């Protein structure tokens, strides 16, 4: 098992870097576990194998959905995203399949995040401390 330690709940850059290395090495999703926070002595997993001759390719649309979904609080979001990008290497149009179960979950996570962002913009108002509100 390869264990990837991400710095925080929203460490998208760390996930992207790890996912790129894993894809280059051809590591299957079942061998990867993503964790939040620092590793301990007992969390040490297998090292990432050396890269092969592949070049990972992901559509901009899929990458946008993944980046939004990674902001969700679902504990399996990082594993789901890696599973999808791994599959996208052999199924480049996976993001266009509305019946794909992984894409259905990813889109639901992204939709939830977008809805929360909208609610924050629409309903949360800030004012300076010390000013009297209406």
Task: Please provide the spans of the model-predicted regions.
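Extended, well-ordered protein cores
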Residues: 1-134
